[in-house]
Amino acid sequence: MLTVDFLASHALAFVSCAVLLGLLVGSFLNVVIYRLPKMLHRDWQAQAREVLEMPPVPQAETFNLVLPNSCCPQCGHEIKPWENVPVISYLFLRGKCSNCKTPISKRYPLVELACGVLSGYIAWHFGFTWQTGAMLALTWGLLAMS
């Protein structure tokens, strides 16, 4: 409860926490943006095969928002936790895969930055209110859909 009171009475701390939370959510949204269309496509294909009474295609591996772990699309290098820190790891790796040195799309840090900046602005504009929570959820959802 002490933390809640502190955040409610210190706007800078609240906005800073909102920015950090926004960066983390932005990192997760990158996963959603990349994987959800692929998951839907697989599901639609399976449904179509069922309706057309065709044999199902065996799925090679589990593919959802959690599994498999993130990896480089070029070389398959599994991304380590320290390579997955929002924005900072992109700068540290100079925008390239640590294994094959293939450039990483600028979309990833831009989504993270946009989410962090928008979250900070919302926290600053609405303050420590229920509207902030509602606007954050709406903004994150819209960002994922865009």
Predicted regions and their residues:
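A membrane-topology feature that recognizes alpha-helical transmembrane segments
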Residues: 1-146
